[in-house]
Structures are given as C-alpha cells and as structure tokens.
Amino acid sequence: SAIALVPDSEWGYRAGEAFTDFWIAEGGNLVSFARYGDSTSHADLLESNLHVDASIARKNALQGNLGRALEFTPRRRQDVDALFLAASPQQARQLKPMLAFFFAEDIPVYATSSIYSGFPDPSADRDLDGVKFSTMPWILNNDNELRNNLSNQTNASATALRMQALGIDSFYLSQRLIQLYEAPDTIYRGILGKLSKDSQSNDLEREQVWAQFIGGLARPVNN
C-alpha cells in the first residue's frame, strides 16, 4: 500500500496519475493521493494523510473521558508500505525531513527524477538521504568528460542535461535502427539508459537506472 504525494500543478497531476495507473495495474493499493501547493501547510498535509491527527484526536477524547492528562506518543497509520513523491529538489528538501517529525521516517520514499538537480550538492541534499529515484545514467555520471564539457559551456540545468542526452542518443540510434528492428533482442546501452524495441508495439522502450541519496550524494543502486 502506498501514499502518493504530488505538487498541485498540471505536471504533478500527470505524474500522480501515471504512478496510480502503474501501481494499481501491478496489484498495489493506493491509500492516499495528496496534492501540495506553495500555500499548503506541508505539516498539516502530512499529519492528515499519515493519520497522526486522528491519533491525537483519540488521545484528546480519552483524556476528556478520564478527566486527567495522559502520557502519550502519537502514532501514524500502519497500512503504508511506501511513499511516492513527485517534487523538485527544493520541494523535496522541505517535505522529506517532516516525515520523521510525523513518525514516518521508516517508510521507503520513491521519487521522480525531478528530485535531483543533476549536480552534487551534499550539504543541501543531505535531508534527502534514503530517497530512491530513477534517472538516466548520464545524470549520475559526474566523471563523464562530454557531459562536463557541455555543462561548463552551457551552464546547463538538469533539464538541459537530459535534452543533451536525448540528442546524443538520438544521433547514435539513427545509425542502429535497422539492427534494433531486425534483431528483437538487441539492447542499445545509451546514456539515456537501456534502449530496446517493444516486440508488440515496435516502440522504443527505455530502462533507466535507480539511484539513492546517501550522505547527500546521489549514488547508483545496483539492484
């Protein structure tokens, strides 16, 4: 069972819908779909969707019935196995630390690639430790000479880096399309990820890599 937490925007809605469709198709259960905005109290949103407010309400009702104060530690809902987060780096840096405040630091968080700026920033991203996200190998390869040269020349953002990767792989793929379509099992390992042809639709499919924030740095996950 999962909670989806997405921004209150057109992109956030699309990301949330895509996750919901996939999750349910895979047999998952979505227990909450929450949308946050710039004016939304993130604390209130998390407290409500994690049912911490309900725990506090039960305590208050019990105190009222007994007529005395009780020692009490609020509890979050126990039917959540994962949290899907669609967020920018700035949004995620606000939201992720609050999970611990609401007793949910043990819930695995899986995010969209938008959570990572594309450039190492351990002091800013330390609050994201533990979050896993999928991305293209190009974004994680800080030692790639071509990537660094393009980045330095264009002062590239993460979005620009992704567009550059698309252009580079498109060029090389144009020379390998016949091979991809004639040999169904062919896999092209590009900087976008593993590219192959779907046997039914003939569309090109891309398999990205997984990364996790460890010590404020985005590091590849082996499996």
Region locations from a protein language model:
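Segments of small-molecule ligand-sensing domains
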Residues: N152-V221
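Active-site proximal loops enriched in glycine and acidic residues that flank catalytic Cys/His/Asp
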Residues: V6, A87, A111-S114, T135, ...
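N-terminal post-signal-peptidase region of extra-cytosolic proteins
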Residues: A69, Q94-P97
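Surface-exposed patches in mature extracellular/periplasmic domains of secreted proteins
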Residues: A2-P7, V31-F33, I107-V109, L161-M163, ...
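Hydrophobic alpha-helical segments within soluble ligand-binding/sensing domains
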Residues: S1-I3, R14-A18, P137-E145, L166-L173
